[in-house]
């Protein structure tokens, strides 16, 4: 059974593409028809692509991978932030910091700077600064929080990107392509699908369509996380059982050596007593 239905997508307006004159010919396989000079997306293909993408994303989450959500367009910011946070995934909803992926060490330094400021506040160092220094640091902290706060826990490059609006987020897509990071994306009729690893043909402007598709991806992530959590106790039990098996094996080996030693001693005694018996005769 599909994770998402044709009717749900239709109701969300996911089928509305862009004007015919704005189309990208590479999206032709995903276009159903043209109506009133607007391309209509084939939602049957959208359903299949959503299922495909969701299964891959679920597997990534199950393996402890991080998926970075990127959506800086106005109508997508709030829902993407909420959905990504609900499954503990990093996200970017403000301006994409150039080099965020290709120059990741520098981005991590900026995040560490934010952490250092927090430590200064916690240990009282901040209180000893002048008013001017306090103001400068407070402004710097606010700026860092706005652009990097949502990725503060991302200690390494993400395993994948999920992008809403390929054209608007072209810098993020290009950086991911350069590093070989898989890209999942909602791709409208005016975009180039060749840059995307997992294409989900859809209207990328309609809020309902964005919430529906991204919500489905986050549900798949949550399933993967739950399966990962369920498997951990089994792994712990296996790890606990291993030492017990080793102890039993060592104990068995000791008993075996003890039996061998006893058998050897008995044989030696018999050999020693044999001549005495002959002499007695």
Swiss-Prot record:
Compositional bias (Basic residues): 245-256
UniProt keyword annotations, A-Z: Ribonucleoprotein, Ribosomal protein
Database matches in Pfam families: Ribosomal_S2 (PF00318)
PROSITE patterns (alphabetical): RIBOSOMAL_S2_1, RIBOSOMAL_S2_2
Keyword Cell cycle in record: no
InterPro entries: Ribosomal_uS2 (IPR001865), Ribosomal_uS2_bac/mit/plastid (IPR005706), Ribosomal_uS2_CS (IPR018130), Ribosomal_uS2_flav_dom_sf (IPR023591)
Biological process, per Gene Ontology: translation
GO CC, any one term: cytosolic small ribosomal subunit
Region (Disordered) residue spans: 225-281
GO molecular function: structural constituent of ribosome
Sequence ranges of Low complexity compositional bias: 262-272
NCBIfam families the UniProt entry points to: rpsB_bact
Similarity-based family: Belongs to the universal ribosomal protein uS2 family.
Protein name per Swiss-Prot or TrEMBL: Small ribosomal subunit protein uS2
Species name: Porphyromonas gingivalis (strain ATCC BAA-308 / W83)
Lineage, top ranks: Bacteria, Pseudomonadati, Bacteroidota, Bacteroidia, Bacteroidales
GN (gene name): rpsB
């Amino acid at each position: 059974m599909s994770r998402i239905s044709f009717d749900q997508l239709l109701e969300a307006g996911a089928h509305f593409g862009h004007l015919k004159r704005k189309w990208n010919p590479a999206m032709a396989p995903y276009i159903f028809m043209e109506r009133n000079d607007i391309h209509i997306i084939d939602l049957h293909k959208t359903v299949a692509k959503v299922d495909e993408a969701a299964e891959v994303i679920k597997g990534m989450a199950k393996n402890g991978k991080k998926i970075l959500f990127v959506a800086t367009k106005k109508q997508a910011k709030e829902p993407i932030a909420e959905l990504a946070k609900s499954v503990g995934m990093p996200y970017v909803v403000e301006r994409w910091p150039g080099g965020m992926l290709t120059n990741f060490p520098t981005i991590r330094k900026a995040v560490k700077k934010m952490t250092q400021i927090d430590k200064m506040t916690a240990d009282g160092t901040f209180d000893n600064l002048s008013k001017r220094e306090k103001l400068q640091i407070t402004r710097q902290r606010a700026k860092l929080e706005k652009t990097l706060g949502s990725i503060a826990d991302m200690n390494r490059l993400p395993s994948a990107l999920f992008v809403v609006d390929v054209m608007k987020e072209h810098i993020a897509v290009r950086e991911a392509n350069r590093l070989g990071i898989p890209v999942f994306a909602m791709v409208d009729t005016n975009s180039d699908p060749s840059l995307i690893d997992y294409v989900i043909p859809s209207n990328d402007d309609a809020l309902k369509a964005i919430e529906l598709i991204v919500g489905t991806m986050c549900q798949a992530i949550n399933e993967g996380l739950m399966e990962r959590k369920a498997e951990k106790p089994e792994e712990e039990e296996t790890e606990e059982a291993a030492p017990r098996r080793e102890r039993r094996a060592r104990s068995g080996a000791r008993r075996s050596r003890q039996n061998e030693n006893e058998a050897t001693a008995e044989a030696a005694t018999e050999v020693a007593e044999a001549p005495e018996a002959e002499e007695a005769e």
